[in-house]
């Protein structure tokens, strides 16, 4: 799916349950960009993966935990997760994250 131009409405949301949906927007072997929509109160449980992750809060308010430290982030804020660091998110106000992974998440396709 290494399309160079992707229109938002051309990609379907995948329902992950518990008020969370995901759209894999584009990827190649080296990188992937994903939108994740959260309902208020939804929890992205603590987890880790070998991929480096950078995330942009495009909408809403989230409590983001990385390596045991939690901070509240608002629309326009960014966070970075190094490889294999435990992290997660709690949606305080309905919102959306734009996640970039390097390399791509093979488990998402």
Please report, for each region that a protein language model flagged, where it lies by residue:
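A short, N-terminal "cap"/entry segment at the start of jelly-roll beta-barrel domains
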Residues: 1-30
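Glycine- and acidic-residue-biased ligand/ion/polar-headgroup-sensing regions
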Residues: 51-62, 67
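Short acidic-glycine-tyrosine-enriched beta hairpin
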Residues: 69-83
């Amino acid at each position: 799916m290494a399309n160079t131009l992707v229109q938002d409405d051309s990609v379907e949301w995948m329902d992950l349950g518990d008020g969370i949906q995901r759209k894999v927007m584009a990827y190649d072997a080296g990188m992937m960009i994903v939108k994740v929509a959260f309902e208020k109160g939804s929890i992205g449980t603590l987890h880790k993966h070998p991929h480096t992750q950078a995330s942009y809060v495009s909408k809403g308010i989230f409590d983001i935990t990385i390596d045991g430290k939690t901070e509240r982030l608002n629309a326009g804020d960014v966070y970075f997760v190094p490889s294999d660091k435990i992290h997660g998110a709690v949606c305080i106000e309905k919102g959306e994250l734009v996640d970039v992974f390097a390399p791509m998440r093979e488990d998402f396709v």
